Design a protein with these regions (language model features):
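A short, hydrophobic beta-strand-centered structural micro-motif
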Residues: 81-90, 167-170, 184-216, 325-342
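N-terminal segment of the mature soluble domain
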Residues: 49-72, 125-126, 130-137, 141-185, ...
């Protein structure tokens, strides 16, 4: 059984997460997915392409609900036609198992999402710090590369599958002195704040589970972002499925904040950026803006001292685009009057 609660949470990690930044990374494998296959036959490849495209659609939108979109569902049977390249790999989790990794056409995926009105979550995404405690045969310990490398690998795969950057604690002397297993499971606010503060991340996922004698797993996930907390209790058939629940909790919550239902028509927006003092600044601003899935073009219209005025051809309104831009901590919103721009920022080095 799974329950989900979202509410304002101002005590546990509140001070830490408000002060910390939503450090973001560019997800480079947004349009690729790896799925299992029985063999290398054309029939298996065709079936796998559909499965892989489902993963990509969910990754790009951030939410599994995108698969209920009629246009998205209608595109799945022809998935094989839109595979740019593929390769086979051994499945490290299944003896003798086989995986196929597929890369899909970026333009096909983005155009379909935009034309269907499905939400699009740009590749610039917040990094999540994960503390995970496992209990087996009465023994509790943090899950890390030494105690449970297979589960760590599963955690990495699930975050990659949902397109969310992952930060695992170092679990060195600094971490273990700041946070004990019991404190993590009890959500001890002071200890979690102290242990997490060194990583300077706004998004923290804390999980704890017990492995039962029949192999089933029972536990709970708590996801903190700023002053908000999401909670999910889960009973799963395996550790892998329990991990999937936790990662899904994060991805769905993030997508609700950052994914934008793009407009099929381009919107012309003027963006003012102050603090541009070198060609490197100039190129950095323009190239980053053009890397956003919701921005078709970013053309510099004028340069006045250290301020540039950029004309954006975007598939989102100004307020929607501002939500995405806030993830770049070098672009700080500023109140500017008399400039005639829809968006105003300071380029902070």
């Amino acid at each position: 059984m799974i329950t989900l609660v979202r509410r304002s949470f101002g005590i546990v990690l509140g001070l830490l997460l408000v002060a910390a930044s939503a450090r973001a990374e560019i997800v480079k494998d947004l349009y690729s997915a790896e799925v299992p296959v029985a063999d290398q036959s054309p029939a298996q490849l065709a079936s796998a392409s559909r499965d892989a495209l489902e993963v990509v659609f969910v990754k790009v939108s951030g939410s599994s609900s995108v698969l209920r979109n009629p246009a998205v569902a209608a595109a799945l049977p022809s998935a094989r036609q839109h595979v740019q390249q593929y390769s086979y790999n051994k499945d490290p989790g299944v003896p003798g198992g086989l995986l196929v990794e597929m890369l899909f056409e970026r333009s096909f995926v983005n155009n379909l999402m935009i034309e269907s009105g499905a939400p699009v979550w740009t590749a610039n995404r917040p990094t999540v710090l994960v503390w995970l405690v496992k209990e087996e045969a009465g023994v509790q310990q943090f899950v890390n590369a030494e105690t449970d490398p297979a589960l760590v690998a599963q955690l990495r795969r699930e975050f990659s599958r949902r397109g969310v950057p992952l930060q695992l604690p170092l679990y060195d002397l600094v971490d273990t002195a700041a946070l004990s297993v019991d404190q993590a499971k009890a959500l001890n606010s002071a200890a979690l704040e102290q242990a997490s503060s060194r990583y300077q991340l706004q998004d923290v996922l804390v999980g704890g589970f017990a492995l039962q004698s029949d192999g089933r797993v029972a536990g709970k996930w708590n996801y903190f972002s700023g002053s908000d907390r999401s909670q999910r209790s889960a009973t799963a058939e395996s550790e892998a499925l329990f991990v999937r629940e936790g990662v899904g909790l994060v991805a769905e919550a993030m997508a609700a904040r950052y994914a934008v239902a793009a407009s099929a028509q381009d919107v012309g927006l003027a963006m003012s950026v102050t603090g541009v003092t070198s060609y490197a600044d100039y190129a950095g601003v323009v190239s980053w803006l053009e890397s956003l899935e919701l921005v078709e073009r970013a053309d510099v219209e004028s340069v006045q001292g250290d301020r540039i005025l950029v004309r954006l051809q975007a598939q989102a309104a100004a307020d929607q685009l501002a939500t995405v831009i806030e993830l770049n901590k070098q672009l700080v919103p500023i109140p500017v009057t008399g400039v005639g721009a829809d968006l105003n920022y300071l380029w902070q080095k």
